[in-house]
Regions:
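Short N-terminal or domain-adjacent regulatory/targeting segments
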Residues: 2-42, 138-153
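Adenosine-phosphate binding glycine-rich loop
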Residues: 15, 20, 24-36, 41-47, ...
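N-terminal glycine-rich anion-binding loops that anchor highly charged ligand groups
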Residues: 37-46, 54-71
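Short beta-strand segments
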Residues: 51, 107-111, 168
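Glycine-rich phosphate/diphosphate-binding loop of Rossmann-like nucleotide-binding domains
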Residues: 54-64, 138-247, 252-266
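Short beta-strand elements in bilobed, periplasmic/extracellular small-molecule ligand-binding domains
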Residues: 69-83, 187-200
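Phosphate/diphosphate ligand-binding glycine-rich loop within oxidoreductases
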Residues: 73-142, 264-267
Length: 311
């Protein structure tokens, strides 16, 4: 699969009545910034990716990131680990990357093999270089960052603060860290592993939702279901849903497809961030942006003799 395939949305999407929230406007801003900053200081930013060859999708993800890194002016170093690697082995590799001053950003590509202790492995990455969960050493989940940037670009951030946000699924992008940050940033967030068309907001455990349940609100659905391409049909989405953000990813013979059925793109009441072309390209470009910003932090700490890189 060519990396560009994830960045562009199919022409078929444009024929529907739904409003498309495409990532290209946000990507354009980040790309321009990367071109200005990548070589500043005479040092090329380096992003290191640890991955496990769990299948064709894993290799596709590596290639897609390589394509974006080349466009951003970021060197891209890939470290393949055995699928049966132990937590200790992966931590040993992370330690080497933490200590290497040539490496500025570190990403461990999901999904991780089942035998690994994911929180321990992910938590071992130096925060300075952890481009998925930190920005300038502050906790800032990359997917939540991409979500906010997309809504801001389309003037929807303020309405999102008043909407019910239903996060459905779990996996490579919807993680515990993503859900935690979304609940910190937005008052009416609920998360579940599956998609329930009969979802009743009055049954929500989220305190803010319980207090406001009688107030009519628009709803936003964010999905990463791993139930197959086009799993969410139009009949499953209630009228009060105003925004759908598709984080599903399926590489098929027809190209990349997300969780949303094409029938949803015919609903004029919806704003949709599709796969491909919606949130996912923004995620990729934020990885590059954070790597470039981390370059300056790493250089500064090396100059000052800081020992926090020696984890």
């Amino acid at each position: 699969m060519e990396g560009i395939e994830l960045l562009n949305f199919p022409l078929a999407f444009q024929n529907g009545s739904a409003r498309l929230l495409t990532g290209d406007l946000v990507v354009r801003d980040i790309e321009c910034w990367c071109h200005r900053k990548a070589e500043k200081g005479g040092v090329t930013p380096v992003m290191a990716v640890i991955y496990f060859n769990t299948g064709a999708d894993a290799i596709d993800y590596v290639k897609i990131k390589a394509h974006v890194a080349a466009r951003a002016g970021v060197s891209y170093w890939v470290y393949e680990m055995p699928v049966d690697a132990s937590t200790t082995q992966v931590m040993s590799q992370v330690k080497k990357l933490n200590k290497n001053p040539q490496i500025h950003g570190i990403l461990i590509q999901r999904p991780l093999p089942h035998q690994l202790n994911e929180p321990v492995v992910m938590g071992y990455i130096n925060p300075v270089k952890n481009i998925e969960e930190y920005a300038k050493c502050r906790v800032n989940n990359i997917a939540a960052d991409a979500f906010v940037r997309l809504l801001t670009k389309y003037g929807l951030l303020e309405s999102a603060q008043q909407a019910r946000i239903q996060i459905v699924g779990f996996g490579n992008i919807i993680t515990k860290e993503f859900i935690k940050q979304m609940k910190r940033q937005f008052p009416y967030v609920n998360a579940s592993r599956g998609f329930d068309p009969s979802y009743d907001a009055s049954k929500d455990e989220h305190e803010a939702l319980q207090m406001e349940v009688e107030t009519p609100r628009d709803s936003i659905i964010i999905s990463e279901l791993h139930r197959g391409p086009g799993f969410i049909k139009s009949s499953m989405v209630k009228p009060e849903v105003s925004v759908l953000l598709d984080l599903g990813f399926y590489a098929t013979e027809k190209g990349v497809i997300g969780d949303l059925s094409h029938s949803l793109f015919d609903r004029s009441s919806l704003a949709i961030a599709p796969t491909p072309g919606g949130v996912l390209p923004i995620l990729l470009w934020i990885m590059m942006e954070r790597t470039i910003k981390a370059k300056n932090t790493v250089a500064k700490e090396e100059l000052e003799g800081c020992h926090c890189l020696a984890m």
